[in-house]
Each structure stands twice: as structure tokens, then as C-alpha cells.
Amino acid sequence: MMAETGGDRPATERAVGYHDIDTDSIISVEQVNIQAQKLAEKVGKDVISGLASGDPFVKIEGLRAGYGKMEILHDFDLQVGERQSLCLIGPNGAGKSTVLHSIFGFTNIFSGSITIGAGAGARDITSLSPNQKLREAGIAYILQDKSVFPAMTVEENLWMGGYLMDKPALAKQKAEEIFEKYPRLAERRNKPAGVLSGGERRLLEISRALVMDPHLLLVDEPSIGLEPRFIDMVFEILHDLQHIDGKTIIMVEQNAKKGLEFADIGYVLVSGELAMADMGDTLLANPDVGRLFLGG
């Protein structure tokens, strides 16, 4: 768990972090970073490739990327197989969201490559724009909370997900398929998105990304700001998207326990570098990962 001490509260006072787990000790963000760096080990390319099932569907090699002239990711590698899920965890400022931003085209890439597609169908998408990555490469980015258009109806929000389609009728057709899939949204199709509950808004955000029928979902903090019952609902939806609909998922998740329980593969980032990589359940059982990121 990453919780900062506040005010004059004694360091031994029990506290509850964002994982809803009690802990007898509070570790500052600075200490998490320091201790995580001590745990960091050089993760070889053989380890990275071994965790991906079959030919990698998403492959990042030697990526140096950031914002403006500031480099956040340093020689970063990643591989995930088709229909697999990968969760990125780590201290604040480790570069987790920057990985998603880089895949989707929101960063400056100084060197390295990003490819999508398996085997002979692999395509270099490093220099494509976000619109090209959505329309041509089948990559959708599901932003953090509060990305719906509150004054628009649920139905209109879904139509917006198809803004790159050649014909508006195609977006409307896809919206109807989504309403059939998620009756909870269908019941609210004519209501302003601003009146939805937190869980319903997240469902709408995910559904809007599905309008373009992407192959790869980049999911940024799916549990942030949600009550526990809605968190479970969102991860059930993501589970079905992976295992029933065949989507490949790369996510950043502040609730490291929930993210590692969900994902096939887990990566720990520290200071813009890959510090640890293993199967999600293996990292979940790692006592050092538990101490720093899972609340004990």
C-alpha cells in the first residue's frame, strides 16, 4: 500500500489505504519508491517473452518516451499475447500510465518500437496518431473516470464512440448491439450520462470504447473512485471482454491486489523501468510486492 503520513498522526496508528485493508504501519510514497528500487532486478527479454502466450500480440522494444523533452520511460520492454491481460503496478510516478499513453500515441517517443499483431501480421504502430491507432490498428483507450459527456444521453455518448466510422448509422448499429449486451445501459439510454452512478459511468466508458470493435483495450485505473460493489462489476465486465470476446487488455490499476488477481501477467515499474515481471498470481504471492503495494 502506498499511503502518506499526514499531520501529527503517529506512524504506528492503524490506517486504511485505498485497498480497504487495515495496516499497522504506514509507508510514505518516498519510502515505497526507495524500497521498490532496492527490489528491482534486471528483467531479461527471455522472461518477458516467456510470460506472453504464443507469438506476442503487443510488443514494445527499447522504448524511451515521455512528455516534451522529459524522458519518463527508459529502455522499456513489454510483451503480451493475444487474449491475454497484463497489469502494470508500481509507485506513484513510476511511468505506468505513460506506457498506455505511449502505445496510444500521447507521448513523445525518442527511440524504440511498438508493434501490434502476431507473427507475420505484426505491424509497427510507433509513429501512428491516436486516431490511426483506433481506426486502423484496433486500439482503444479507456480513460480514467469522468470522461463521459454528462449533458449527452447514454445513447449519444455511445454514438460518440464511433466518431471515426464512415457512416453514423454504423455507430448507431453498434450502440444497439451494446444495449443488447448490457441491459443496465439500455434502461438508461435516454437519460443524461451525468445522472448515472459511478459504476454505470464506468460501464458507459468501457462500452463507448467497444463501438469501434477494438482488439486491444488500454484501461487506465478502472477501479478509481468506485465503491467496492462497482469495482467487482467492472472487473467482471473486463473478464468477459477478455475471455468471451477475445480482447487483449493492458491496464494500469491503483488497486494492485485487484489488478494482479485479474491479470495473467503483472509488471512492476520503478522510475520508468521494468523492475519485476511474472504471472499475476505469482506477484500477488510475493511478500515484498505484498508489503509495498498490497497493504501488507
Regions found by a protein language model. Give the residues of each.
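ABC ATPase C-loop
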Residues: A209-L210
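ABC-family P-loop ATPase nucleotide-binding domain
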Residues: M1-R64
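Conserved ABC ATPase signature
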Residues: P192-L196
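Helix-to-loop junction immediately C-terminal to a conserved catalytic motif
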Residues: F104
